[in-house]
Amino acid sequence: LAAGLQRDLFDACQGTDAIVYHPGPSIGYFAARELGIPSILAAPFPMTPTRAYPSLIFYDKTRLGGRANYATHKVFEQIMWMAGKSPIRQFWQQEFGRPPQDFGCPYGRQTTAALPTVVSCSNHVFPRPDDWPEHVHNTGYWFLEDDAGWQAPEDLLAFLDRGAPPVYVGF
């Protein structure tokens, strides 16, 4: 099942301009590297390390200060990575006869404007920390609300007109 899912996800990435990926199926990061296109980490919760507050899995625990808060995010990154790396490695070995380029935990590699992170949380629930880099955007929650008066910006319309419709793979 996991190998088939990796195949489906990788196939869906073919011919795209960029890959927006959920932290669970992190194959999106490696597919983008293989295809030479940008990747965008779309996290439903804060994943970028900060000293301001601990990682989600430690959030209700005793607060130990900035360094400990930062460390909890690195621990969480590794837990997420450990849970998902084997199917990626297996697929890549079968497909390419080698592991992905720079195979390792991808979350901390979204470190530039070319590799941004978007977080779908409210600044009122998880305030944007001062120590997050500029390429991390706390966008607020993503809803499928119908706004009949909304108009897409011209640059977005031009982008969409240049190619096939975007495809989202996730949940």
What do the PLM-derived regions correspond to, one by one?
Residues 1-166, 171:
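Nucleotide-sugar-dependent glycosyltransferase catalytic domains
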